[in-house]
Regions:
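Conserved nucleotide-sensing/catalytic segment adjacent to the nucleotide-binding pocket
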Residues: 40-43, 52-100
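Hydrophobic positions on the alpha1 helix immediately C-terminal to the Walker A/P-loop
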Residues: 29
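Conserved lysine of the Walker
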Residues: 26
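NTP-dependent small-molecule kinase module
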Residues: 2-7, 111-112, 152, 174-224
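Phosphate-binding/switch loop-helix module in NTP-utilizing enzymes
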Residues: 81-116, 123, 210, 216-217
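P-loop (Walker A) phosphate-binding loop of NTP-binding proteins
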Residues: 21
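ATP-dependent NMP and nucleoside kinases share a basic, alpha-helical "lid"
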Residues: 104-156
Length: 224
């Protein structure tokens, strides 16, 4: 039976970071967790929304930039929004267009619900971001499977060609994974392999979140 979080109350949002390489299934796990825990209990935020706006850069240059390094992100805004959510303040995350590499203004509101699920490839690289998480999960997936998933996503959802996705993977994604993503795996609270069906993985992750929520509730009760 799928657990629900409705019986567990928290004093402030519990922020859960879900990290891992491109194509590791982070977004899919976030959606499954939200379904398991209940949409009324969960907010979702993607680090991808915080890519820097490249509207001032010629399109021919934008296509050659490296989007898999820490400098590609507006980290100051991301940290400010995480801090606001921790304080119970609703934020409005940016909207980013992957086809044009431009920011499209403000997106939907992200409320400070009992659980805030955050996903991104470089979530654990920045110590300040790591410190914002009450629980961090790293999804460990073999490179071949990550590439297959990235191809399906970028070609099917982001208007990319197969050739361009493969070029980018070889030029920037693979080296950045080795330099910035994989070294953060030991920094996660929990490492989960995501090579099979999503449902069992989501059940495990849901149980981890509920356990942390229950611990916080017990700690508050003991301090009262």
């Amino acid at each position: 039976m799928t657990p629900t979080a409705t019986a567990v109350e928290t004093a402030r949002p519990m922020i859960v970071g879900i990290a891992g390489g491109s194509g590791s299934g982070k977004t899919s796990l976030v959606r499954a967790l939200a379904a398991n825990l209940g949409d009324t209990q969960v907010s979702q935020l993607s680090h991808d929304a915080y890519y820097r706006d490249r509207s001032a850069v010629p399109m021919t240059v934008r296509a050659t930039l490296d989007y898999d390094v820490p400098e590609a992100f507006d980290q100051d805004l991301f940290l400010a929004h995480l801090a606001a959510l921790r304080e119970g303040v609703t934020i409005r995350a940016p909207r980013y267009c992957f086809e044009t590499h431009c920011r499209l203004g403000e997106g939907d509101e992200v409320g400070a619900k009992p659980v805030v699920l955050v996903d991104g490839i470089l979530l654990l690289w920045d110590p300040a971001v790591r410190a914002a998480f009450d629980l961090s999960i790293f999804l460990d997936v073999p490179e071949r499977m990550r590439l297959e998933r990235r191809l399906a996503r970028d070609v099917g959802e982001r208007g990319r060609s197969t050739a361009s996705v493969l070029r980018q993977f070889d030029a920037t994604v693979r080296p950045a994974h080795a330099t910035y993503v994989q070294p953060t795996q030991p920094l996660a609270d929990v490492v989960l392999g995501n090579v099979g069906r999503l449902e069992p993985l989501a059940e495990i992750a849901s149980a981890l979140v509920l356990d942390r929520l229950a611990r916080r509730a017990r700690a508050r009760a003991g301090a009262a």
